[in-house]
Regions:
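Positively charged n-region of N-terminal signal peptides that target proteins for export
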Residues: 1-7
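Bacterial N-terminal signal peptides
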Residues: 8-19
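N-terminal regions of proteins, emphasizing targeting and processing segments when present
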Residues: 13, 27-30, 113, 117
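Signal peptide processing junction and immediate N-terminal pro/mature segment
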Residues: 20-32
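N-terminal low-complexity, Pro/Thr/Ser-rich intrinsically disordered segments
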Residues: 31-54
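Acidic/histidine-rich, surface-exposed loop or edge segments in extracytoplasmic proteins
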Residues: 34-41, 89, 122-125
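Short N-proximal segments of mature Sec-exported proteins
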Residues: 49-112
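Compact alpha-helical subdomains of small soluble proteins
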Residues: 90-164
Length: 164
């Protein structure tokens, strides 16, 4: 069984502004996210939201001018440039209202990376592929296209099966 973990820390910071007002910020960084054989299956059911996440990530990475090729997997909503990982995280937050690390959309991008790199081992597929010196912006867009096409095709097949 394949098991990948992101070691992490959950940091909670509280700031008292006045005796009646309290502001709390929670920062999750490198939170442990296990994977399993089930999550690594390439035939997971897909949803319209999966397709929208991939389409939105591609929109976020509209040009090479907004691509951050030095990913750290720390994403800030105020950023002006986005790595592959951060574009997917931002898209997930916009579409779902939350980030789901092992969501089918993100897994499909990981699978596209594996296929494009002929199974090269990465500790963090999205970050490491993004940061490879040989990776070009066009490669990032192609990875998103492959994942989008796969999800779109599976969604169409699922919807076809539902018809009477």
């Amino acid at each position: 069984m394949r098991l990948a973990m992101r070691l992490g820390v959950l940091l909670t910071v509280s700031l008292s502004l006045a005796s009646t007002m309290r502001v709390t910020a929670v920062v999750a960084q490198n939170t442990a996210v296990p994977t399993s054989d089930e999550l690594e299956r390439r035939d997971q059911p897909v949803t319209n939201e999966d397709l929208r996440i991939l389409q939105r990530a591609s929109q976020i990475l509209a040009s090479s001018a907004v691509w951050n090729r030095h990913d750290t997997r720390i994403c800030n909503p105020a950023d002006k440039t986005w790595s592959l990982f951060c574009a997917l995280e931002k898209a997930s937050l916009e579409v779902l209202g939350e980030y789901r690390h092992r969501d089918v959309a993100l897994q499909e991008v990981r699978f596209a990376v594996e296929d494009a790199t002929k199974g090269q081992e990465f500790e963090h597929r999205l970050m490491d592929y993004n940061n490879l010196p040989s990776t070009k912006f066009e490669d990032i867009k192609q990875i998103l296209k492959v994942a989008t096409d796969r999800v779109s095709g599976r969604l169409a097949a699922q919807n076809h099966k539902k018809l009477p």
